[in-house]
């Protein structure tokens, strides 16, 4: 959430920075609500001060010998009661305006970092680096073709169980998924991450804190009878792990690695990636999350991205890093790197991780502060996939395919899977 002080002191900056995202925002209504709230706060404060003075006058009169039931004392007490009633009315009006202002502010995305490249769409994203040699070949198959021949997952039966865009992993497919999850969590634990297994049902406050609500409600699955949603990413529960808390500066940075199933409606993706593991309603992911000091967030962003890249390099998967332009960044992000893995069967790079620094945007929405010296201030949050499991499996299948129909697995994964190759079942 954006800082209300910025709205008051420099609304032009908000308009300018949101314009870099391609948004035209009229802040007039927001400014009016904010001014009304400040005016009410001033009125309430003045009335409370007057009420305090009235109370002191009553005390001085009685101390000076006036009877508690004298007309003068009664008049002052009646005045004090009227002031209390007026203050109560103003407090309710103030709460209503606060709620209105918060509702409006929650709908605005984060301001992009000054370092984020300008642009309108993914076509303006900037390639930062490449790693590995992309495999080329006319006869290379896509992962869903390989998986079908190897018997790694069921699609048609999954539609019967649920609906389209669900799969059931079978045999070596299920074992490979489990191996990848364990491998990733173990690798991240060596880099100082604390492993977390959070709830996958989260409440509205958690989704609001991370930035999914109110804007993206239609993209999430909601329980009909409770204020609970299936989490679209572990970023949501990890953000709220320290909601409404003050953390000692000595504890920072806090680094978490969490495996969760993730659930997304994928609204607007009709007809795209209808086969295989790329775009599903339910998928598994290992998420990396940092709470850090504001002065360390740029350094933390680079390290978080390197930690996600370390998984790809250990699995010998060629990839590239892109820096997203201002028009293509996510709602909560101030700056983002996307990692795209090479899929030789498809002949293209596909996103497998998005690593973002959110500044104090999520911390303000979730009231997460740190204590340094005598005061407290908002910390910074960062998140990134480390990695999406299904897309990693797709990349392993396409990059490891052999002429005999088997799949060669990378050496780092063999201790977890138990074999060097996948062969037709």
Swiss-Prot record:
Gene3D superfamilies: Bira Bifunctional Protein, Domain 2, Serine-tRNA synthetase, tRNA binding domain. PROSITE patterns: AA_TRNA_LIGASE_II (PS50862). CDD domains: SerRS_core. L-serine binds at residues 233-235, 287, 385. Homodimer. The tRNA molecule binds across the dimer. Belongs to the class-II aminoacyl-tRNA synthetase family. Type-1 seryl-tRNA synthetase subfamily. NCBIfam families: serS. This is Serine--tRNA ligase. It comes from Synechococcus sp. (strain RCC307).
């Amino acid at each position: 959430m954006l800082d209300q002080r910025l709205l008051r002191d420099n609304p032009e900056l908000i308009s300018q920075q949101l314009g870099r995202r391609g948004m035209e925002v009229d802040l007039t209504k927001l400014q009016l609500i904010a001014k009304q709230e400040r005016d009410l706060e001033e009125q309430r404060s003045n009335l409370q001060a007057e009420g305090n003075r009235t109370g002191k006058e009553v005390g001085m009169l009685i101390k000076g010998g006036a009877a508690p039931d004298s007309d003068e004392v009664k008049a002052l007490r009646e005045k004090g009661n009227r002031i209390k009633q007026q203050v109560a009315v103003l407090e309710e009006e103030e709460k209503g305006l606060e709620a209105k202002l918060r509702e409006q502010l929650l709908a605005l995305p984060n301001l992009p970092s000054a370092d984020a490249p300008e642009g309108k769409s993914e076509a303006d994203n900037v390639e930062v680096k490449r790693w590995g040699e992309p495999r080329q070949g006319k006869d290379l198959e896509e992962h869903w073709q390989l998986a079908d021949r190897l018997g790694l997952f069921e699609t048609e039966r999954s539609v019967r169980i649920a609906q389209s865009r669900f799969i059931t992993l079978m045999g070596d497919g299920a074992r490979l998924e489990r191996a990848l999850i364990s491998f990733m969590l173990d690798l991240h634990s060596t880099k100082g991450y604390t492993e977390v297994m959070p709830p996958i049902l989260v409440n509205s406050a958690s989704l609001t804190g991370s930035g999914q609500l109110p804007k993206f409600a239609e993209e999430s699955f909601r329980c009909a009878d409770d204020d609970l949603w299936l989490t679209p990413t572990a970023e949501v529960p990890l953000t709220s792990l320290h909601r409404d808390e003050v953390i000692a500066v000595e504890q920072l940075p806090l680094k978490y690695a969490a495996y969760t199933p993730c659930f997304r409606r994928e609204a607007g993706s009709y007809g795209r990636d209808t086969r295989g593991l790329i775009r599903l309603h339910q998928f598994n992911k290992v998420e990396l999350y940092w709470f850090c000091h504001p002065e360390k967030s740029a350094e933390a962003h680079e390290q978080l991205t390197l930690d996600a890249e370390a998984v790809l390099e250990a699995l010998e998967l060629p990839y590239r890093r892109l820096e997203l332009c201002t028009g293509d960044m996510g709602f909560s992000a101030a700056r983002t790197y996307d990692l795209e893995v090479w899929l030789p069967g498809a002949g293209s790079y596909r996103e497998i991780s998005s690593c973002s620094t959110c500044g104090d945007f999520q911390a303000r929405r979730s009231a997460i502060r740190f204590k340094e010296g005598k005061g407290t201030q908002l910390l910074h949050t960062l998140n990134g996939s480390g990695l999406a499991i299904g897309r990693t499996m797709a990349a392993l299948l396409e990059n490891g395919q052999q002429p005999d129909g088997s799949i060669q697995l990378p050496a780092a994964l063999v201790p977890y899977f138990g074999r060097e190759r996948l062969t037709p079942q």
